[in-house]
């Protein structure tokens, strides 16, 4: 196991996402090419709380999946750094998810991703989202990449 601390700038150098759609604040653990653990701190003023739900804010499940998917991209980057450096387009081919408990303002969302099988342009990743010891969601992703042509790469 490797204890690490990647800040938001390091994360932005890997993920194509930006605020308000960047759902990883830090990476706290990397275990070789097997596991990545990341954190999203859920703030009171997150824009999605305005409508989901007024007076009883709950993080939408689809955004928990997005956070787990972003952690999975970081795992992919660690497994395939040379391919990842070409800034490919990432996509989810299949998602199987289960939601177990709500995520609310003030929660520290821990995102664990496990490499089931990552090959050149695709992978299968198991993901778990938790707050403390409470599991809030589980997912299995089949993800893929589409290589960009040199003129398509965003700088």
Regions found by a protein language model. Name each.
Residues 1-29, 155:
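N-terminal leader/capping segments at the start of a protein or of a new domain
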Residues 2-5, 72-110, 136-144:
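Hydrophobic beta-strand-centered segment that forms part of the acyl-chain substrate-binding groove
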Residues 3, 104-107, 115-155:
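HotDog/MaoC-like acyl-thioester-processing domains
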Residues 12, 55, 98-101:
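Beta-strand-rich interaction surfaces with strong enrichment in secreted/lumenal proteins
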Residues 19-59:
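Catalytic strand-loop segment that frames the active site of acyl-thioester-processing enzymes
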Residues 21-23, 109-110, 123:
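Hydrophobic core residues within well-ordered beta-strands of beta-rich domains
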Residues 25-28, 100, 112-116:
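Conserved positions in beta-strands of structured domains
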Residues 50-74, 91-92:
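Compact, glycine-rich, soluble single-domain proteins
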């Amino acid at each position: 196991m490797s204890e690490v601390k990647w800040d938001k700038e390091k994360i932005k150098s890997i993920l194509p996402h930006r605020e308000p759609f960047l759902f990883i604040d830090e990476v706290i653990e990397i275990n070789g090419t097997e596991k990545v653990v990341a954190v999203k701190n859920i703030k009171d003023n997150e824009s999605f709380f305005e409508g989901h739900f007024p007076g009883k804010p709950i993080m939408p499940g689809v955004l928990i999946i997005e956070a787990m998917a972003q952690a999975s991209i970081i795992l992919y980057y660690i497994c395939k750094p040379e391919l990842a450096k070409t800034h490919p387009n990432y996509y989810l081919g299949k998602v199987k998810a289960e939601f177990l408990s709500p995520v609310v303002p003030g929660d520290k969302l821990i995102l664990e991703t496990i490499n089931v099988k990552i090959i050149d342009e695709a992978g299968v990743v198991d993901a778990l989202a938790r707050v403390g010891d409470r599991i809030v969601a589980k997912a299995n992703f089949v993800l893929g990449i589409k290589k960009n042509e040199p003129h398509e790469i965003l700088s």
